[in-house]
């Protein structure tokens, strides 16, 4: 593997262990030329997943789109980056466990909302307001009422 510091290809693995998510392997490497250390992750290659958009267009699955939406929803909330990454990992695992080659974007959105609802109600409402495209205040208020009713059960 090429060293990210000096560009030489003489590197060796000095430590290898399962990563936090147990679906990848974290490897600590050292360059034989410059002696600097760096970390790499090895992950199982998954079958390519295609997302069916609302307009029926198809595009390759892109984890960063889910991350961006969740990060926006959690902005200025007491939610750590680790919690957000764990949520996105859960969403991704759920999607891949469907074992479908094509997944509608609305299914992905529902999975994200389900995970966000249990993490933070405000982040959930923020995500839902964009995802569900609330047309007016009444629709927005109805969704808030559902959340409040659910919390008081």
Curated annotation (Swiss-Prot):
Record-annotated ATP-cone domain positions: 49-139
Family: Belongs to the NrdR family.
InterPro entries: ATP-cone_dom, NrdR-like_N, RNR_NrdR-like
Cofactor note: Binds 1 zinc ion.
Pfam families: ATP-cone (PF03477), Zn_ribbon_NrdR (PF22811)
Protein name: Transcriptional repressor NrdR
Cofactor(s) essential for the protein: Zn(2+)
Keywords, in A-Z order: ATP-binding, DNA-binding, Metal-binding, Nucleotide-binding, Repressor, Transcription, Transcription regulation, Zinc, Zinc-finger
Keyword Nucleotide-binding recorded: yes
Zinc finger residue ranges, unnamed: 3-34
Domain of life from the UniProt record: Bacteria
Record organism: Lachnoclostridium phytofermentans (strain ATCC 700394 / DSM 18823 / ISDg) (Clostridium phytofermentans)
GO MF assignments: ATP binding; DNA binding; zinc ion binding
UniProt function note: Negatively regulates transcription of bacterial ribonucleotide reductase nrd genes and operons by binding to NrdR-boxes.
Gene Ontology BP annotations: negative regulation of DNA-templated transcription
């Amino acid at each position: 593997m090429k060293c990210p510091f000096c560009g030489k290809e003489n590197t060796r693995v000095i430590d290898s262990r399962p990563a936090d998510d147990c679906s990848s392997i974290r490897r600590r490497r050292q360059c034989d030329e410059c002696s600097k250390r760096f970390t790499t992750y090895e992950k199982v290659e998954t079958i390519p997943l295609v997302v069916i958009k609302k307009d029926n267009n198809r595009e390759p699955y892109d984890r960063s789109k889910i991350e961006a939406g969740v990060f926006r929803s959690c902005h200025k909330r007491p939610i750590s980056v680790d919690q957000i990454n764990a949520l996105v990992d859960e969403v991704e695992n759920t999607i891949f466990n469907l074992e479908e080659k094509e997944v509608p974007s609305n299914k992905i959105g529902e999975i994200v909302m389900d995970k966000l609802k249990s993490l933070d109600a405000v982040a959930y409402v923020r995500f839902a307001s964009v995802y569900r495209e609330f047309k007016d205040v009444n629709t927005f208020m109805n969704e808030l009422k559902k959340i409040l009713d659910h919390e008081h059960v």
